[in-house]
Amino acid sequence: MEASTVRTQDHYVTFGRREGDEDFPNSLISGISTFLGAQVIPPVRDRLEEAEVKAAVLGLPWEGTNTCRPGASYGPRSIRRATEHYLSYHGEFQVDLFDALNLTDCGDVSIVPGNARRTFDRAERCITEIVEAGAFPIIFGGDDSCPIPVTSAMSKLIEGKMGYIQMDSHMDTAEAVAGETLNHACPVSRTAELPNVDGHNVALVGINGPLNPRVEREYVDRTGIQMVTIWDIDEWGIDKTIERVLEIAWDGTDGVVLHTDLDVLDQGFTTGVTTPETGGLTPREVIKMIRAFVRQGVDAYVITECSSVYDPANKAARVATRLALDALGVRANPAGTGRV
């Protein structure tokens, strides 16, 4: 009689072993690809509550408003594949993410091709179900319009004022692009318009380069949005930068949404992004900031612009994976040192 084994959380599914045979789980070449090999539960509140899920990932493979290099819709799948190189035990926080958070993969939002509004409505419903189940959501885009449904959903779920941090080389404060208000250049403006968001609680971190139009800077100045440029970071150092961003986003707010556009990193580290920029942050600098922000208390985290079609080594997806795993590590063990 041959045995069958299904152990998604251990990164693999194998069949054909005989009873008592030893098995070697190699997630790089076998198994069903979920985030870190996590169990799959749809974004349905009752199902997530029943499983006592404390953290869940959700893919939003949407790039229907992108005006730059394509490929970000492959981001969620690329990131899941990149997690095959990692363990559920995070040695720097001395915690197993499955044991501590019952980490779950909620799959992907069902995209409506060509229709941003309907796609974002679906995304909002999924995010709402996850949060109302008591789980911390990490959302993988998708282009830079993907934070729009995240902040929209969270603004309704957070009782009180909401802060927003966008780590990005670009301001993304366009009010519209060719008349379209859900464009990938508009996530910050759409967020700043929410009824419980004030501009002075919105932090743009890492802004740099010549792809920041005058009209977007005028919007920043007009609305009181706080901008921390790459040159501010260069002058202040990471620790002072973190202090400044904490002051901005948590000043009188009751919840904060964090967004990392992978192009905030120098393109030498993240080749596979939609809008690469030279002169950005290093992975270590971004990791340190992510840890500090999540430790302070982030209610949702979204990562965008992973476009593996330009990245044979899958570097951007691996960076995204590391950022997500460190955010989860802090959630699982806030008192952890973050060192092996």
Give names to the regions the model predicted.
Residues 2-340:
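Conserved alpha-helical scaffold segments that buttress catalytic/binding sites
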